[in-house]
């Protein structure tokens, strides 16, 4: 047989024998019944079931697993014979023979049956008279156990040492806890490293902190739990992207091209905290709100439409946080930088609190009881916060993030936020706002009206590629789950029982 043909065939490594029950046994006991047990033997390995007392139709349902010493294949010269010997336990004297059966495993495997449940007739010993001794029901299943490195304990066990050897170890300063013992292990535990070389220790810690490779190789290789825990990093990168959109159109396209390149690992570096606070201070200025009101205020937009391709692909199935004040005007940048710098420390502390939103709050939409009180009181602790230019934008952004963009809450809405009465808007812009008609609240084109034709094409191509990769990944997961379910049903069908009854193991004979 060629190696290519042999690689395509399935060869078992173990055989699992389950002795279910027996019937029509000859009575050997005093009261016309038997105390019956069965010996299961393959090669030199033996197992025994428990004793079913005072019955002629015992039921055991006990299994024993044997490792095949060689390769079981069609046309193999080596024969594997499974022996089942039914015995009656005798309290006085030797146990009495009730019957036996010899099953050729090669014939069952050549019939291409991985599992076989059948009644076998019990036979007499060789040279004895043939008579009806009853039947036994047995389930035979061929299995393949892939022996990986994780299934072995590579650490060597301590041997029994003489008192002189132990005294010798004490003289050499060896300890009994295994730190300085002469045992070896392939898996080295992490121990305390000396501080003599700090550069080596820091490099070693960086190597240990490297994450393991995921199981499935694909574009979306991280689990949903990992991706949901990294939502804060994606929000920071999206805010950095929005702050970079201030300026001419060619700068916008350049920023989109630079941010659109997502590495294959699905992670994106978050900007520096000080740089982020400086950029978001420009976003939260009143000038940006006025400019938003003049151009696109009053339009009902979908909170999910401003998701750009800069976000990693693992966040594709989760709701994003939307900043309602996307645009800002250049004349306000230079004048409002003076107001944003004194409150930079306070904004950093608020942003850290907002980043620490738990995974439970993101999924269920529930929040702490303190947050609604803060919103009702105006979102500030002191009156000076109300006068600051970023107080309104910070509170409005918090309210929008937790109430508007979370589709799991009952208060989900896709409409834009109206400015408060404390915010001063010039009368000309307010008159223009009244003339703008109300559009569809779920207008998907609202976030793309400020983009050029080339930028819209780039977004379309990126979204189509993202959907294609997602469909491929979902199809791979479905196939994997289907194959896994079929294997579970074939290998252990008892797991589908309601209620689940674990199978009993037969006792193994020890060579004494």
Curated annotation (Swiss-Prot):
Keywords: Cell membrane, Endosome, Membrane, Phosphoprotein, Protein transport, Repeat, Transport. A motif (NPF 1) lies at residues 323-325. It is found in: Cell membrane; Recycling endosome membrane. Phosphorylation at Ser-227 by MARK2 regulates epithelial cell polarity. Residues 465-512 are annotated as: Necessary for interaction with AP2A1, RAB11A, subcellular location, endocytosis activity and homooligomerization. GO terms for molecular function: protein homodimerization activity; protein kinase binding; small GTPase binding. InterPro entries: C2_dom (IPR000008), C2_domain_sf (IPR035892), FIP-RBD_C_sf (IPR037245), FIP_classI (IPR037789), Rab-bd_FIP-RBD (IPR019018). A motif (NPF 2) lies at residues 406-408, 440-442. Residues 15-102 are annotated as: Necessary for its cellular translocation to the plasma membrane. It is a peripheral membrane protein. This is Rab11 family-interacting protein 2. The lineage of its organism: Eukaryota, Metazoa, Chordata, Craniata, Vertebrata.
């Amino acid at each position: 047989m060629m190696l290519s043909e042999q690689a395509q065939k399935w060869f078992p490594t173990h055989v699992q024998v389950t002795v279910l029950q027996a019937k029509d046994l000859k009575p050997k006991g005093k009261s016309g019944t038997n105390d019956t047990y069965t010996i299961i033997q393959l090669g030199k390995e033996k197992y025994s079931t428990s004793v079913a007392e005072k019955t002629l139709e015992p039921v055991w349902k006990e299994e024993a697993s044997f490792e095949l010493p060689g390769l079981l294949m069609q046309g193999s010269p080596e024969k594997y014979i499974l022996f089942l010997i039914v015995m009656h336990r005798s309290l006085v004297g030797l146990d009495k023979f009730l019957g036996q059966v010899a099953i050729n495993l090669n014939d069952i495997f050549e019939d291409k049956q991985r599992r076989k449940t059948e009644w076998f007739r019990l036979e007499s010993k060789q040279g004895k008279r043939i008579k009806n001794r009853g039947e036994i029901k047995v389930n035979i299943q061929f299995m393949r156990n892939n022996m990986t490195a994780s299934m072995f304990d590579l650490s060597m066990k301590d041997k029994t040492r003489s008192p002189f050897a132990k005294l010798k170890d004490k003289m050499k300063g060896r300890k009994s806890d295994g730190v300085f013992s002469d045992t070896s292990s392939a898996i080295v535990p992490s121990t305390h490293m000396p501080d003599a070389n700090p550069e080596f220790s820091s490099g070693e810690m960086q190597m240990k902190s490297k994450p393991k490779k995921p199981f499935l190789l694909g574009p979306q290789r991280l689990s949903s739990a990992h991706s949901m825990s990294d939502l804060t990093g994606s929000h920071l990168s999206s805010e950095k992207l929005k702050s970079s959109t201030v300026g001419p159109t060619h700068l916008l396209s350049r920023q989109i091209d630079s941010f659109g390149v997502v590495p294959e690992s699905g992670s994106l570096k978050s900007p520096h905290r000080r740089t982020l606070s400086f950029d978001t201070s420009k976003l939260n200025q009143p000038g940006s709100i006025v400019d938003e009101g003049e151009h696109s205020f009053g339009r009902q937009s979908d909170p999910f439409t401003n998701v750009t391709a800069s976000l990693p692909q693992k966040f594709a199935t989760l709701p994003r946080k939307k900043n309602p004040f996307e645009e800002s005007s250049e004349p306000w940048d230079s004048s409002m930088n003076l107001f944003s710098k004194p409150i930079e420390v306070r904004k950093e502390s608020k942003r850290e609190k907002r980043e620490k939103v738990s995974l439970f709050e993101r999924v269920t939409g529930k929040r702490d009881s303190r947050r609604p009180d803060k919103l009702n009181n105006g979102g500030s602790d002191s009156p000076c916060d109300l006068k600051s230019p970023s107080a309104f934008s910070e509170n409005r952004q918090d309210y929008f993030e937790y109430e508007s963009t979370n589709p799991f809450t009952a208060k989900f809405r896709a409409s834009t936020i109206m400015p408060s009465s404390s915010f001063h808007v010039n009368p000309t812009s307010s008159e223009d706002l009244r003339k703008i008609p109300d559009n569809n609240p779920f207008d998907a084109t609202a976030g793309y009206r400020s983009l050029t034709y080339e930028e819209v094409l780039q977004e379309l191509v990126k979204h189509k590629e993202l959907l294609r990769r997602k469909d491929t990944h979902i199809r791979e997961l479905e196939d994997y789950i289907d194959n896994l379910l079929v294997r579970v049903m074939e290998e252990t069908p008892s797991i589908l029982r309601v209620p689940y009854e674990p199978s009993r193991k037969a006792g193994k004979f020890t060579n004494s």
